[in-house]
Every structure is written in structure tokens, then in C-alpha cells.
């Protein structure tokens, strides 16, 4: 990725107010993370303050995420909203980052029909942590290593950026991205359905989706093995089929999302002793530890 100079952005509120956002969250078991809730409350407040229409839709107790996403789309298409915004219940974001995404989409709706934010997988790439730690750039703030410790949920578009370099302060084209934070224009689903009539089906879980008996909906999201023998998750399958329609998938590298989850903490005193590592917090390290966790930051 290449860097460019940052600049202040004047939101195009007139264009943004013409949008109607349908924020949908599949929420298995009716559960979400506190950080998701905080982000949602901040976002709702911002949207109301700026006069941008937004409604919320939650789908509880659907264990199959593919079916849940298709139900969300079906209910979105019944509404008058212009854009479906998928945000998963384990994602945390800054409200102003979402406002900026909305601004970009509103500025050029025809171009940015699919816009996504990138978030890390629920894993720690220890080799990346080791490489970053050896660089010496984190000696004064070791907790910042968590910012470079993961693999992101997307695949780059190598044809668009053959040299492997892309700007990070403007939207970039990607091959595939996760649906956990994705804004999609209504027309994308309309073109998708027209191109794939074979994906129409009758939903069987009528209670969860508020469907009438015999009603037909589309499987926009499903897991498949494609013609290159790749196993595609439902979000990557969606991206692949959308790109075949000539619609680009755009991502915003500069916004920061958190992917909430659980982690198993391990510790072995014998190994600590062998490496000369303190079993408890060392006194000389206390002053070096500075909290850099986003949920402790004030909204900018």
C-alpha cells in the first residue's frame, strides 16, 4: 500500500440525505457485543443529527448465516431504502468512519455501488508480530503491536494493482471482501436476481423472515465451489458473482474496524523462565505500556 497526505473532508450532506440506509445485522441468539452496541448508538446519533434516513433490522436465532443474509436482503427489498448496510454483531467501528463511507457513496452512487470496510480475522499472525517487534518501531508502545497482528478479511485485486501497491487514503478495488461491514445499493440485488433466476427459492423458516406462504426470495449469499475449484464463503461468492456483472467491489483501507471474539490465554512458567521473561508484570515495563485500545478513545 502507498500513502498519501491526509486532508479534512467536508461531508456532502445534501447528497447523503437523499440516501436511505437499511442497517441489517444477523444476530444469532439475539446476542451482540458491547462494542457493537456502542458503535451503533454513536452512529444512530450521528445519522439523526445530520438528518440522514436510517432504519435498523435485526434477525435473531437464525443459525445459518447464508440464510440470515438472504432474509435480510429480502426484507430490505420490501422497504423503500436505497442502500443495505450489513454490519455484523461482532464488529466495532467509529461513527465518523461510517459517515465518511456514506459521504463517498453519496458523492458517486453509480461508481460505489458496493463499498466495504476491512476488518481482521479472528486470529493472531505471530510471525507478523515477531517481524514488527524486531523492527524496533514498537519499543515505546508495545501494545500497538495488536494493530499489525492479524490477517484482513479480503483478497486484493491483482489485475487492478499488478505491482502490489495501492493507495490507502482513498477507495481501492478488491477482488473479495467480508460482508461484515458492507454497503450495497439496491440496484445490485436487482441486477443480480435478473442474472441468476436459478437462485430463486422458497424460504422454509417463515417465522424468522416475515414471509408469506409461497413467497419467493433469492439466494444472493451461499457457499459454493467455483469453476477454479475454490471454496467460497457466502460473502466471497457474492463478490465474485457481482464482479461478473461488471460491478466493482470497493474498500476503504483507512478506516479501522474491530472484530470482537474470544481468545484462549496460555502461559507456561518453565518457558518464561527459559526465556528470561517475568512471570508477572516487570517493574521496568510498566512505564512503557500505554493503552491504545480504540474503545478507550473519544469519538473524533
Question: What feature does the model see in each segment?
Answer:
Residues 70-83:
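Active-site nucleotide-sugar/metal-binding loop of Leloir-type enzymes
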Residues 2-22, 194-300:
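C-terminal catalytic/acceptor-binding lobe
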Residues 1-63, 67:
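N-proximal low-complexity "stem/linker" segments adjacent to membrane-targeting elements
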Amino acid at each position: 500500500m502507498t500513502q498519501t497526505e491526509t486532508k479534512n473532508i467536508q461531508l456532502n450532506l445534501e447528497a447523503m440525505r437523499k440516501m436511505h440506509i437499511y442497517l441489517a445485522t444477523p444476530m444469532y441468539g439475539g446476542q451482540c457485543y458491547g462494542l457493537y452496541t456502542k458503535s451503533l448508538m454513536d452512529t444512530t446519533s450521528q445519522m439523526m443529527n445530520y438528518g440522514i434516513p436510517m432504519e435498523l433490522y435485526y434477525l435473531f436465532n437464525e443459525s445459518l448465516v447464508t440464510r440470515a443474509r438472504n432474509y435480510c436482503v429480502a426484507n430490505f427489498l420490501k422497504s423503500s431504502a436505497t442502500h443495505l448496510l450489513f454490519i455484523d454483531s461482532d464488529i466495532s467501528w467509529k461513527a465518523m468512519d461510517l459517515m465518511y463511507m456514506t459521504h463517498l457513496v453519496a458523492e458517486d452512487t453509480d461508481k460505489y455501488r458496493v463499498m466495504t470496510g476491512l476488518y481482521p480475522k479472528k486470529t493472531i499472525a505471530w510471525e507478523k508480530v515477531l517481524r514488527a517487534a524486531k523492527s524496533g518501531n514498537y519499543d515505546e508502545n508495545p501494545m500497538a503491536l495488536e494493530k499489525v497482528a492479524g490477517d484482513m478479511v479480503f483478497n486484493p485485486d491483482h489485475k487492478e494493482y499488478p505491482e502490489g501497491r495501492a493507495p490507502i487514503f482513498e477507495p481501492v478495488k478488491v477482488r473479495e471482501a467480508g460482508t461484515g461491514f458492507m454497503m450495497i445499493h439496491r440496484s445490485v440485488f436487482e441486477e443480480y436476481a435478473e442474472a441468476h433466476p436459478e437462485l430463486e427459492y422458497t424460504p422454509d423458516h417463515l417465522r424468522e423472515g416475515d414471509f408469506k406462504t409461497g413467497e419467493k426470495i433469492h439466494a444472493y449469499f451461499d457457499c459454493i465451489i467455483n469453476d477454479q475449484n475454490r471454496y467460497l464463503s457466502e460473502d466471497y461468492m457474492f463478490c465474485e458473482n457481482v464482479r461478473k456483472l461488471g460491478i466493482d467491489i470497493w474498500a476503504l483501507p483507512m478506516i479501522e474496524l474491530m472484530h470482537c471474539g474470544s481468545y484462549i490465554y496460555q502461559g507456561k512458567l518453565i518457558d518464561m523462565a527459559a526465556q528470561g521473561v517475568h512471570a508477572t508484570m516487570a517493574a521496568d515495563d510498566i512505564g512503557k505500556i500505554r493503552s491504545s485500545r480504540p474503545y478507550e478513545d473519544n469519538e473524533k
